[in-house]
Amino acid sequence: MIGPAAQRGTGPRGGIRTLLQSVPKTRRYNSLIREAVLAAIAFIGLCSPGLASAQSDDLIDAIRELARENFDPVKIGAGYAAMVDFAVSPDISSANFYPDASDGVVDPSLKHFQFPLRFVFGDDESAPRPFLQAVVAHQTVESGFDYAPGEFIASEWETWGFSLSGGYDVPLSEHLSFLPVLGVGYGSLDNRARYSGPISEQLLQPALAGLVFDWDTSAVTYGASLGFDYRRTLAGFDVEVLGSVSHHYVESIDAPNEFVDFRSRMSAFDLDVRTIHPTPWKMFGNPLSIVGLFGNTRIFGPERDALGFDSFFEAGAGVDLDVSARGWKLKSLRFGVKAIFGPDVDGWGLIIGYRL
């Protein structure tokens, strides 16, 4: 048992609490491993005269209790909701994000892949047309913390998700369409951690397993978005401007315990600008155009930095193949590469797009 000194805040547990309260809560801490950072620093607080008289089980219980007090699964839910927002785009894409991290925190990486299929009902583009979009998405978040010589914790989150959304493509003019959309989705979230070093293996692993690390759950998401699609020809370029404001709610449905149960909300604004310049060339017998890509995403809400960043830009280039003469349902296919950059993140991605 923890003695009276600890209860008064002068023993090991008091040292833990003091250090927990002094950790800077900046956006540059990766939110998904921040609790591990806190727990690791908390153990440093245990290196006090009270350590000699404390039992290992008591230390594990103390770390677990304080991690439970500071662990906020809402951040995990908010991070998942933010990743769901990435799937709003109709493009097949693979992106790699590398958020910045603080000293001692290994720079995390977020890998996102999505495969959407969109079905538009009706051929009259001058009239409102309903559409359905199904998306299969996969994400991994890898991170870690090197908090002492010979000590390391590596964490990996893996999520699989499926969403189905429906909406209307409502023409407002020759160039502008309005896109209201509602959606629902299901996802699985799984975490696995690797511990290296005696402190990590003997104290932090039993203290944090099933709470901060090494647990899985499922979640349902509900979302709505209002978007626009503006297209016209300017100075020999076909210009497309797509924008949307979206809001997603995510809720765990079979959390292993009450401490990792979450309900989170996330809002985002996405802007995507594409310029298409026809060329005299052909690829595989299809007219070829050069495409310029520019985009911006901003995440809003109290947990907007759950992924370690709340905004980023995209810039890239690609090619567009006009396949309309083949009689397919598709009008064009697009392939490109993009750079991702922002105040707290950088990365890159690949795009395979299509236009119906």
Please describe what each predicted stretch is.
Residues 47-49:
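N-terminal signal peptide c-region/cleavage motif recognized by signal peptidases
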Residues 60-68, 122-268, 298-300, 304-310:
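Outer-membrane pore/translocation modules
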Residues 108-116, 159-163, 219-225, 268-272, ...:
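Transmembrane beta-barrel architecture of outer-membrane proteins
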Residues 53-150:
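Short glycine/proline- and aromatic-enriched beta-strand/turn motifs that initiate or cap beta-hairpins
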